[in-house]
């Protein structure tokens, strides 16, 4: 029993999950739904990716580009000396000369970055200006045609750091805008937009930023207009300003964010400010709806679809279902860009999930929209760096709309299958993105997690076992309904996974005979590639836990190393446990009172406690553990079963059996919530204060053990004498 109070706390350091995380740390499925431009437009202008790709292509076969080079648009900066060598190796003298000048420009820019937090001296400023002027003059001196656009862009960049904004405006109007479409021309146009903004022409600057797909700069320029008053002001100046696309999208998504965070007033908006969102309270949101509908009807805007959809999504968020249905219906038939029409269609789909009836017509409509979303996801998906909008649309529509809809309609299996379908689509994408199938030695079973961080597993784990059997039967069937067939075809249905889960859950219920047919089908490969395998391989259920703790030896000193999750399992201990428990229970039922019955009862207690959520072999009945574990209402309380069997033995005529049982009871009660013999608090000076609980089960068990040790000291072994908890109990003045 040594340190068994602390032992319960130490279980927290095991690399296993906490079921509470399924709620507090799980996904919200609440990504922004309103999107009238691609999300990567907020990462910067589109030409950055094109310029990056230009250099990758130029060095193809000579410099390998990794994912960071591609997604971070940093290929040239990461390899600029190598790119120069490539140009020289190609004999491209014109490019080599340009690269040397470009590198000089980058070096000057780096000087400004170094001094971001300090003031340079006059001499340093003068030196930088001289270097920038030299770059400007060298760029102007170029007389070739091959790299004319690059050199013109370099002139504008040099002008920018010199503060020559008027010169840039003239250069754009006289030369830049006459160039053919290219990434270099777009970069010049972006600098020209900056010039307009600095001269006070805010909306004209936004027009230019929009042409280069640079919504992030529009956000920066329109920072003080991110509210209804700002939207009205811009609309009054230009009903078709590209800035309105950003401002309207930002407003609607901020309404959603405000409702999610639930601030009571502006003083509660700290987190929204931290994530660069704006508080939009109900009155302003309602006023926006009326303004948006007015704009859509006026005829001044070329994109009424934008405004009808914005009104519909806002009303949906505010709970005005009928208005949202009417407004999104208007949006579907209104003029707008293709992206706006797609946005209206996606939001209309979400709105219908709140009030639709699950008849054949609606499920047929849903299936068509699901397939449409699949096509949109495929078309928009590119790299891991791009957060696909339509993936989020489908995710929110399924989790926030369809799951509750099917659950309320009495179809919980379909609701769970929809949830799992989304998990499988996400898992397949990440597996593809990381090319896991190419990793040698990576078992397919390592994708199958019984993890408390997985919301599908959490739902299945909270089911009664017969319900889970029904769910598995559903996803492996061929339903008559086309939407159900679409869903179950995409749901996870590996027989090893479900045999393990169902068999383990039957064990948790104490239904050993029902568990055996499922557990018999498990392979050692599957068991070895589960996160619990490291515990399964190193602990045994017949070890007496109150006299011996079985430590886990990890494969790596790195706590979160994957090597600490997996261990080769050579036998099916869960199956062996089931068979042994059935054998012991059968013998117990046939044995009369006396020593044989007591020995059987003690052996059952040992196994019940080891297989409980408090034992070393918790993996027998669960796939994870935490310090807050306890038996669930539908499970067999293994610890309670252990106590009942120990109570039968504590009055044994066999003194050794009596001692072992009294010690075991004092130990086991330490793990049961509410049974602890004392608690610790602190006084005003932070001195430890012991609060004894004579009414608790552990206190009474310790008192019995203490009385036995006092009256029969010769029968107490050294292990019990060294027990710090018993020593503490004996030392205290425990009279209430």
Which residue ranges define each predicted feature?
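Sec-dependent N-terminal signal peptides
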Residues: 4-13
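C-terminal segment of classical bacterial N-terminal signal peptides
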Residues: 13-19
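Extracytoplasmic/secretory-pathway proteins
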Residues: 20-157, 162-736
């Amino acid at each position: 029993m040594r340190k068994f109070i602390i032992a319960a706390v130490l279980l927290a350091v095991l690399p296993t999950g906490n079921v509470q995380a399924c709620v507090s740390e799980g996904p919200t499925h609440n990504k922004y739904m309103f999107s009238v431009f691609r999300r990567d437009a907020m990462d910067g202008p589109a030409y950055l990716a094109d310029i990056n790709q230009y250099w990758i292509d130029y060095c193809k076969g000579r410099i390998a580009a990794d994912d960071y080079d591609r997604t971070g648009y940093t290929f040239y900066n990461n390899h600029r000396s190598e790119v120069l060598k490539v140009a020289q190796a190609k004999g491209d003298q014109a490019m080599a000369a340009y690269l040397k000048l470009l590198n000089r420009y980058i070096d000057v820019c780096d000087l400004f970055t170094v001094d971001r937090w300090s003031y340079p001296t006059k001499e340093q400023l003068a030196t930088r200006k001289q270097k920038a002027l030299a770059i400007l003059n060298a760029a102007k001196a170029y007389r070739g045609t091959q790299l004319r656009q690059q050199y013109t862009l370099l002139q504008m960049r040099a002008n920018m750091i010199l503060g020559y904004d008027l010169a840039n405006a003239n250069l754009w109007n006289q030369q830049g805008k006459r160039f053919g479409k290219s990434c270099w021309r777009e970069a010049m146009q972006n600098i020209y937009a900056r010039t307009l903004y600095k001269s006070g022409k805010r909306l004209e600057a936004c027009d230019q930023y929009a042409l280069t797909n640079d919504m992030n700069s529009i956000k920066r320029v329109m920072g003080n207009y991110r509210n209804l008053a700002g939207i009205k002001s811009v609309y009054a100046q230009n009903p078709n300003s590209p800035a309105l696309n950003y401002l309207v999208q930002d407003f609607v998504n901020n309404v959603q964010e405000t409702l999610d965070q639930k601030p009571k007033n502006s003083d509660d908006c700290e987190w929204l400010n931290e994530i660069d969102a704006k508080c939009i309270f109900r009155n302003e949101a309602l006023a926006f709806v009326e303004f948006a509908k007015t704009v859509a009807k006026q005829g001044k805007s070329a994109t009424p679809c934008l405004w009808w959809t914005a009104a519909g999504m806002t009303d949906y968020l505010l709970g005005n279902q009928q208005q949202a249905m009417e407004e999104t219906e208007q949006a579907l038939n209104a003029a707008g860009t293709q992206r706006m029409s797609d946005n209206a269609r996606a939001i209309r789909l979400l709105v219908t999930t709140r009030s639709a009836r699950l008849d054949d017509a609606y499920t047929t409509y849903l299936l068509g929209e699901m397939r449409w979303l699949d096509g949109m996801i495929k078309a928009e998906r590119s790299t891991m760096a791009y957060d696909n909008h339509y993936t989020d649309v489908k995710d929110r529509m399924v989790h926030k709309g369809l799951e509750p809809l099917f659950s309320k309609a009495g179809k919980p299996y379909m609701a769970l299958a929809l949830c799992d379908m989304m998990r499988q689509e996400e898992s397949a994408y990440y597996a593809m993105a990381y090319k896991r199938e190419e990793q040698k030695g990576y078992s397919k079973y390592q994708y199958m997690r019984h993890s408390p961080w997985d919301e599908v597993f959490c739902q299945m784990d909270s089911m009664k076992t017969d319900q889970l059997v029904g769910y598995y039967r559903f996803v492996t069937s061929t339903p008559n309904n086309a939407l159900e067939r679409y869903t179950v075809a995409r749901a996870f249905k590996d027989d090893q996974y479900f045999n393990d889960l169902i068999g383990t859950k039957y064990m948790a219920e104490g239904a050993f005979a029902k568990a055996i047919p499922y557990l018999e089908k498990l392979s050692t490969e599957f068991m070895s590639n589960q996160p619990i395998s490291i515990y399964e391989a190193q602990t045994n259920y017949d070890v007496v836990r109150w006299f011996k703790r079985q430590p886990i030896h990890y494969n790596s000193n790195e706590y979160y190393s994957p090597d600490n999750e997996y261990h080769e399992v050579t036998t099916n201990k869960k199956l062996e446990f089931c068979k042994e428990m059935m054998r012991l229970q059968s013998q117990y039922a046939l044995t009369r009172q006396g020593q044989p019955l007591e020995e059987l009862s003690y052996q059952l207690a040992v196994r019940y406690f080891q297989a409980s959520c408090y034992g070393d072999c918790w993996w027998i009945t669960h796939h994870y553990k935490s310090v807050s574990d306890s038996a669930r209402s539908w499970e067999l309380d293994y610890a309670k079963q252990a106590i009942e069997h120990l109570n039968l033995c504590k009055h044994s005529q066999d003194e050794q059996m009596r001692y072992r049982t009294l010690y075991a009871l004092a130990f086991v009660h330490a793990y049961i919530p509410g049974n602890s013999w004392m608690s610790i608090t602190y006084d005003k000076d932070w001195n430890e204060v012991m609060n004894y609980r004579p009414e608790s089960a552990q206190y009474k068990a310790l008192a019995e053990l203490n009385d036995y040790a006092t009256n029969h000291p010769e029968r107490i072994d050294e292990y019990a004498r060294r027990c710090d908890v018993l020593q503490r109990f004996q030392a205290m003045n425990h009279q209430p």
